[in-house]
């Protein structure tokens, strides 16, 4: 910091959690639905720099995944900005995609 009048003191130790395994059954469903909604777009697992409460579930032995289902224009990414927005079509497509994803993953007909 450029100001020696300010100090930062960590409170407690960081909480870590194990990574969730890439379940092939889940990946298959995501790939199938992605191909229906956005043909030609590959499914690539990534790790977000953001944080969630998923670490508490993973530490309890519950695999936890983050997935938005929102398509954004790379030249107009405004996530968490003061002018945050997405296209209406992206919102509606993402809503339907996530609905069908949850329905597929929670049924016996995966």
Pin down the residues of each PLM region.
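Metal-dependent amide/peptide-bond hydrolase catalytic core
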Residues: 1-99, 103-110
């Amino acid at each position: 910091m450029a100001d020696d009048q300010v100090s930062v003191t960590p409170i407690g130790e960081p909480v870590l959690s194990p990574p969730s395994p890439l379940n092939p059954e889940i990946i298959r469903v995501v790939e199938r639905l992605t191909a229906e909604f956005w043909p030609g777009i590959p499914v690539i697992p990534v790790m977000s720099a953001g944080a969630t409460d998923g670490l508490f579930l993973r530490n309890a032995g519950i695999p936890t995944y983050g997935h938005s289902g929102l398509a954004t224009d790379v030249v107009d990414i405004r996530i968490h900005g003061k002018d945050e927005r997405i296209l209406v079509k992206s919102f509606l497509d993402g809503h339907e995609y996530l609905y069908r994803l949850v329905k597929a993953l929670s049924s016996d007909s995966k």
